[in-house]
């Protein structure tokens, strides 16, 4: 981890990170984080009864447990704004909302109706304007006019699906779905594949998302703010997430180890100089501290900070290159999966930029109308 941050610091005057995803590999020493969190979330409907430590409340926006038989969101109401009458309701026509109408539940309903949650994304995706049923086309070919075509409504406790078809082309379906959600206090309960099954999600107020899988391996999607400047801000954001995450784990699974790790993490946060932060991270790796010793890069992207003011020559790119050009003027390096990968493609990027500058200078110095075709081919295609 420290070597990665050291290199990102070396190039931060030229490149900035965008997407940054990583994993924390499961360790036997820390116990069944997934199982204990699942048990707590499944049995409670108040945020305070899941997250006891009020010091970390401002950092955590929502907890989500997803399985085929139960999808449950627990929201922290205090992290949401007070809505006025003109606040846009995003999702009423997709959901049948059942609530006990208490003050707490009514506030959760208000938030749910206005937040673009994963449930909204899920139901929008499953509502298909048109879908071809190829099985029914086959029936038509082999069965003639007596083939049966389905249209109508089918439903279970949580999902109602309406299928409509045109009499002239009955194998082309229009599908609409409505999902039932039960809202009790801070909980939003339904069923279905609205996220990755058998996962727990912790959504932070800074938009970072932590996904915990059944074996307690974690996938962390680190958010990016416009005001993030350089590697030191990135370290602070990552370790801020660590600090609150580990205190949450200590809260739920009652393992003092996480409180100790949170204290070590806090030393990184309070250090003011980058060199000091990197020294502490290296020390954590040496002592096999959770969060550093089991850190594994998932994928990250870099963007070249400056716009390219010279001609771009796509012919210089390999077919499977991770270097991409956005609108011809923004250079991105995508899907980097290791420090070695990063160093390799940054080096290629730097060399390519220099080659493009040289070719651009030559191209600008010649008369395209009178120059030979072979000469232009050499410049543009090789």
UniProtKB/Swiss-Prot annotation:
Induction: Expressed in the early phase of the viral replicative cycle. The keyword Cytoplasm does not apply. InterPro entries: Poxvirus_intermed-TF (IPR008789). It holds the Pfam family Pox_int_trans. It comes from the Viruses. Keywords: Activator, Early protein, Phosphoprotein, Transcription, Transcription regulation. Heterodimerizes with protein A8 to form the virus intermediate transcription factor (VITF)-3. Belongs to the orthopoxvirus OPG150 family. Acts with RNA polymerase to initiate transcription from intermediate gene promoters. This is Intermediate transcription factor 3 large subunit.
């Amino acid at each position: 981890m420290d070597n990665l941050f050291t290199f990102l610091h070396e190039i931060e005057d030229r490149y900035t990170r965008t997407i940054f995803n990583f994993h924390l590999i499961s360790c036997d020493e820390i116990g069944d984080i997934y199982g204990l969190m699942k048990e707590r979330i499944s049995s409670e409907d108040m945020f305070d009864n899941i997250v006891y430590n009020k010091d970390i409340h401002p950092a955590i926006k929502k907890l989500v447990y997803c399985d085929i038989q139960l999808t449950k969101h627990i929201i922290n109401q205090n992290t949401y704004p007070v809505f006025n009458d003109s606040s846009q309701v995003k999702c009423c026509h997709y959901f049948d909302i059942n609530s006990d109408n208490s003050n707490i539940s009514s506030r959760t309903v208000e938030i749910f109706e206005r937040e673009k949650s994963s449930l909204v994304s899920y139901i929008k995706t499953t509502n298909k304007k048109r879908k071809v049923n190829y099985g029914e086309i086959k029936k038509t070919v082999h069965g003639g006019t007596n083939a049966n075509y389905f249209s109508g409504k089918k439903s279970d406790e949580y999902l109602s699906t309406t299928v409509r078809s045109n009499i002239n082309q009955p194998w082309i379906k229009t599908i609409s779905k409505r999902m039932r959600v039960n809202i009790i206090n801070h909980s939003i309960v339904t069923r279905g594949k609205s996220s990755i099954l058998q996962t727990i999600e912790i959504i932070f107020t800074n938009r970072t998302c932590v996904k915990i899988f059944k074996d307690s391996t974690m996938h962390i999607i680190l958010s990016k703010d416009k005001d993030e400047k350089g590697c030191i801000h990135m370290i602070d954001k990552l370790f801020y997430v660590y600090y609150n995450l580990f205190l949450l784990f200590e809260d739920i699974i009652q393992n003092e180890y996480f409180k100790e790790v949170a204290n070590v993490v806090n030393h990184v946060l309070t250090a003011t100089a980058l060199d000091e932060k990197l020294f502490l991270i290296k020390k954590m790796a040496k002592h096999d501290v959770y969060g550093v010793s089991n850190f594994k890069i998932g994928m990250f992207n870099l963007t070249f900070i400056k716009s390219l003011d010279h001609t771009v020559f796509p012919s210089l790119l390999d077919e499977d290159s991770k270097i991409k050009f956005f609108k011809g003027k923004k250079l991105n390096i995508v899907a980097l999966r290791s420090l070695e990968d990063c160093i390799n493609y940054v080096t290629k990027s730097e060399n390519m930029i220099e080659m493009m500058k040289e070719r651009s200078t030559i191209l600008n110095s010649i008369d395209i109308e009178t120059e030979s075709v072979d000469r232009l081919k050499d410049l543009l295609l090789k």
